A protein has these predicted regions:
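C-terminal transmembrane helical hairpin of 12-TM major facilitator-type secondary transporters
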Residues: 266-310
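A late C-terminal transmembrane helix in Major Facilitator Superfamily
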Residues: 317-354
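Conserved MFS/SLC helix-loop-helix module at the cytosolic interface between two early adjacent transmembrane helices
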Residues: 53-92
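Intracellular juxtamembrane helix-capping segments at the cytosolic ends
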Residues: 108-120, 305-319
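C-terminal membrane-cytosol helix-exit motif in multi-pass small-molecule transporters
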Residues: 164-184, 372-376
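Cytoplasmic helix-loop-helix junction between adjacent transmembrane helices
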Residues: 97-135
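Paired small-residue
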Residues: 6, 77-84, 92-101, 290-298
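Helix-breaking motifs and short loop linkers at transmembrane-helix boundaries and internal kinks
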Residues: 34, 66, 87-93, 232, ...
């Protein structure tokens, strides 16, 4: 793969650490800023909101810029946001800094996906996107545990200082390595972009993304209590088991990209079907420790195997004007799916349903996503 692609991977790594490391620091943040854990947890929701809002807005505002300039500017925003997190004097300031940081997230991955596909031959486009997203999976496997450890040892602010340093390094390598001829989309104005987004085929792609990832996060949000209360693991075992999940993310991401290069429609349906099967098997399988560990890894693999295929699919449906915006909005759709899935899983639990049944209920999401995808494919053949 071309060297500039790994510059995008570095940016993805920094963004991934910044997004997820807060989950392991909520106790420390809450104690330092004088808020409850529940209130500190809203920093996660605030970030997701920033992604959903920032993806379309920043993509439209920077639509006429050369894509290299967009990527460098986004990493500057990301770095400034993390610096503001490290210096935040209050909870409100930290929330504002988290939202600022998140604004760059969706547009970086959206524009980065377009740039990545332009660096390789047509038959390797999905694999190129998968390589960029390897930064996100590496963040979960290596960056988040390391960032959590730094926060526990030296304070949560030290973690954000570290992520700021990663942002500076990513900005530099992107500025040096990404070619200057990474041009903006050929479009007249933002209205043309919006017409692309409103195409039925693009909207159905976005709905497929939302539904697929809602299934993942309806379960992953509650993976710790599933492992301890259903699987019978001690709390000390949760972190090592999550490393298995992270390994699954890496494997699934690369596999999904390679399969999508060979047969995109079959990969989309197949990965969503695999995700639904894993979720359904988790309900009986989590009652035995070996199968619980295996299924946790498979959840990561099946969930992230959908990412590159869904991203390249929306790019193919939005070919030409509006491609960057469609790609960025699809990243926002992943985050919307995360939020919907977490809400749905919590709703099931709140209604008194056994915790072990949540994965089975979550399987409804990828099953529905398959139906939407098949409808989209059928429309495309007409």
């Amino acid at each position: 793969m071309p060297l500039p692609l790994y510059a995008l991977t570095a940016g993805a790594f920094g963004i991934g650490v910044s997004e997820f490391v807060i989950m392991g620091l909520l106790l420390h943040v809450g104690a330092d800023l004088g808020v409850t854990i529940a209130t500190a947890g809203l920093l996660i929701s605030g970030y997701a909101l920033g992604v959903v809002l920032g993806a379309p807005i920043l993509t439209v505002l920077t639509g006429r810029w050369p894509r290299k300039r967009v990527l460098v500017a986004l990493m500057a925003v990301f770095t400034a946001g993390n610096l503001a997190c490290a210096l935040a004097p209050s909870y409100g300031a930290l929330m504002a800094a988290r939202i600022l940081t998140a604004l760059a997230h969706g547009t970086f991955f959206g524009v980065g996906s377009v740039v990545a596909t332009g660096l390789v031959p047509a038959e390797r486009k999905a694999s190129a996107i998968a390589v960029m997203f390897t930064g996100l999976t590496a963040a979960n496997v290596l960056g988040v545990p390391l960032g959590t450890w730094i926060g526990q040892q030296f304070g949560w602010r030290a973690t954000f200082w570290s992520v700021t340093a990663v942002g500076v390094m990513a900005l530099v390598v992107i500025a040096i390595l990404v070619p200057r001829d990474a041009r903006p989309s050929e479009h007249a104005e933002w209205r043309a972009d919006m017409r692309v987004i409103l195409r039925p085929a693009v909207l159905l792609c976005l709905l497929t993304t939302v539904l697929g990832y809602a299934g993942v996060f309806a379960v992953f949000t509650y993976i710790a209590p599933l492992l301890t209360h259903v699987g019978g693991f001690p709390e000390s075992a949760v972190s090592p088991i999550l490393l298995v999940f992270g390994g699954g993310l890496v494997a699934g991401n690369l596999l999904g990209g390679r399969l999508a290069d060979r047969n995109l429609p079959a990969t989309i349906v197949g990965t969503l079907a695999a995700l639904g099967l894993v979720l359904a098997l988790m309900t009986p399988g989590f009652h035995a420790r070996p199968s619980a560990i295996l299924l946790t890894g498979l959840l990561g693999a099946a969930g992230f195997a959908t990412v590159a295929p869904l991203q390249i699919w929306v790019l193919s449906k939005a070919a030409g004007a509006g491609q960057s915006l469609a790609s960025s909005v699809n990243i926002a759709a992943f985050n919307l799916g995360n939020a919907i899935g977490a809400w749905a899983g919590g709703t099931v639990i709140a209604h008194g349903v056994a915790l072990s049944v949540v994965p089975l209920a979550a399987a409804i999401f990828p099953a529905t996503a398959i139906l939407v995808a098949l409808l989209n494919m059928n429309i495309g053949r007409r």
